[in-house]
Amino acid sequence: MTASLTTKFLNNTYENPFMNASGVHCMTTEELDELADSKAGAFITKSATTLEREGNPKPRYISVPLGSINSMGLPNEGIDYYLSYVLNRQKKYPDAPAIFFSVAGMSIDENLNLLKKIQDSEFNGITELNLSCPNVPGKPQVAYDFELTKETLEKVFVFFKKPLGIKLPPYFDFAHFDIIAKILNEFPLAYVNSINSIGNGLFIDVEKESVVVKPKNGFGGIGGEYVKPTALANVRAFYTRLRPDIKVIGTGGIKSGKDAFEHLLCGASMLQIGTELQKEGVKIFERIEKELKDIMEAKGYTSIDQFRGKLNSL
């Protein structure tokens, strides 16, 4: 009995649910081509701003024993660079499943302008609006301000008619899950992506008695194994609270087929990999695909839909 990882997502069919997390291995067209040619089912571009950004001073990304700490500050080549890439790729591969395109403006107005540019373009893929970047000095995360989140989405959906998902920060309180889900259920969102890194962690080099990243006096977003329980909780919380047509992308702590199975069991439709992709490179997709298939076959599952979201309670 062979397990199939075929995944249907927003009228697209992908060979498997795996993709990169925006921010990892997607800065340049060369890296994007490597993702496109890898065993990943889909891929997403680097979160784009209006103009090119250098980001924060280095060192700003460090691998640590159970994951990573980063304070990148949204370095990217600007929206025109990535829009040109995806439009060219659409023309070259018209039958390929949809590409994901990420934007992350420094203000509400910038986000609206970025989305207007996508709306007015010939891009026919899926857009992800990042409302959760924790590493831009002086800029709070929009998605922790519930009124501002609602106000932003109200303005977005006046004009944006293409498939749109939003990337969310981790939430830690049941009341917050309830409040944000109630807001999101009011809008024609395609999906939510949970979670972005856990903001403002601190990792210390005992030998040097020093922090390990330069920006923000060493404070940075935490990813990898450290965040998996929080990521699973957020995936589950949104899967059980959002309208069934709003899908959940699971991100956080996926480095094995077992981790992937857990995210799917919590209700994730697609899976994004960041920290481990940074460590292993694109070959991770082939490994993790095999590991997930092995788990499914051992359990007698032939498709992901047979167990997605069916987490048992005690």
Swiss-Prot record:
<dbReference type="InterPro" id="IPR033886">
    <property type="entry name" value="DHOD_1A"/>
</dbReference>
<feature type="binding site">
    <location>
        <begin position="252"/>
        <end position="253"/>
    </location>
    <ligand>
        <name>FMN</name>
    </ligand>
</feature>
<feature type="binding site">
    <location>
        <position position="195"/>
    </location>
    <ligand>
        <name>FMN</name>
    </ligand>
</feature>
<comment type="pathway">
    <text>Pyrimidine metabolism; UMP biosynthesis via de novo pathway.</text>
</comment>
<dbReference type="InterPro" id="IPR023359">
    <property type="entry name" value="Dihydro_DH_chainA_dom2"/>
</dbReference>
<keyword id="KW-0285">Flavoprotein</keyword>
<dbReference type="InterPro" id="IPR001295">
    <property type="entry name" value="Dihydroorotate_DH_CS"/>
</dbReference>
<feature type="binding site">
    <location>
        <begin position="70"/>
        <end position="74"/>
    </location>
    <ligand>
        <name>substrate</name>
    </ligand>
</feature>
<dbReference type="GO" id="GO:1990663">
    <property type="term" value="F:dihydroorotate dehydrogenase (fumarate) activity"/>
</dbReference>
<protein>
    <recommendedName>
        <fullName>Dihydroorotate dehydrogenase (fumarate)</fullName>
        <ecNumber>1.3.98.1</ecNumber>
    </recommendedName>
</protein>
<dbReference type="GO" id="GO:0005737">
    <property type="term" value="C:cytoplasm"/>
</dbReference>
<comment type="function">
    <text>Catalyzes the conversion of dihydroorotate to orotate with fumarate as the electron acceptor.</text>
</comment>
<dbReference type="InterPro" id="IPR005720">
    <property type="entry name" value="Dihydroorotate_DH_cat"/>
</dbReference>
<dbReference type="InterPro" id="IPR012135">
    <property type="entry name" value="Dihydroorotate_DH_1_2"/>
</dbReference>
<feature type="binding site">
    <location>
        <begin position="46"/>
        <end position="47"/>
    </location>
    <ligand>
        <name>FMN</name>
    </ligand>
</feature>
<dbReference type="InterPro" id="IPR013785">
    <property type="entry name" value="Aldolase_TIM"/>
</dbReference>
<dbReference type="GO" id="GO:0044205">
    <property type="term" value="P:'de novo' UMP biosynthetic process"/>
</dbReference>
<comment type="subunit">
    <text>Homodimer.</text>
</comment>
<dbReference type="GO" id="GO:0006207">
    <property type="term" value="P:'de novo' pyrimidine nucleobase biosynthetic process"/>
</dbReference>
<feature type="binding site">
    <location>
        <begin position="196"/>
        <end position="197"/>
    </location>
    <ligand>
        <name>substrate</name>
    </ligand>
</feature>
<feature type="binding site">
    <location>
        <position position="167"/>
    </location>
    <ligand>
        <name>FMN</name>
    </ligand>
</feature>
<comment type="similarity">
    <text>Belongs to the dihydroorotate dehydrogenase family. Type 1 subfamily.</text>
</comment>
<keyword id="KW-0665">Pyrimidine biosynthesis</keyword>
<feature type="active site" description="Nucleophile">
    <location>
        <position position="132"/>
    </location>
</feature>
<keyword id="KW-0963">Cytoplasm</keyword>
<keyword id="KW-0288">FMN</keyword>
<feature type="active site" description="Nucleophile">
    <location>
        <position position="133"/>
    </location>
</feature>
<feature type="binding site">
    <location>
        <position position="46"/>
    </location>
    <ligand>
        <name>substrate</name>
    </ligand>
</feature>
<feature type="binding site">
    <location>
        <position position="130"/>
    </location>
    <ligand>
        <name>FMN</name>
    </ligand>
</feature>
<feature type="binding site">
    <location>
        <position position="130"/>
    </location>
    <ligand>
        <name>substrate</name>
    </ligand>
</feature>
<feature type="binding site">
    <location>
        <position position="224"/>
    </location>
    <ligand>
        <name>FMN</name>
    </ligand>
</feature>
<dbReference type="Pfam" id="PF01180">
    <property type="entry name" value="DHO_dh"/>
</dbReference>
<dbReference type="InterPro" id="IPR024920">
    <property type="entry name" value="Dihydroorotate_DH_1"/>
</dbReference>
<feature type="binding site">
    <location>
        <begin position="274"/>
        <end position="275"/>
    </location>
    <ligand>
        <name>FMN</name>
    </ligand>
</feature>
<keyword id="KW-0560">Oxidoreductase</keyword>
<dbReference type="InterPro" id="IPR050074">
    <property type="entry name" value="DHO_dehydrogenase"/>
</dbReference>
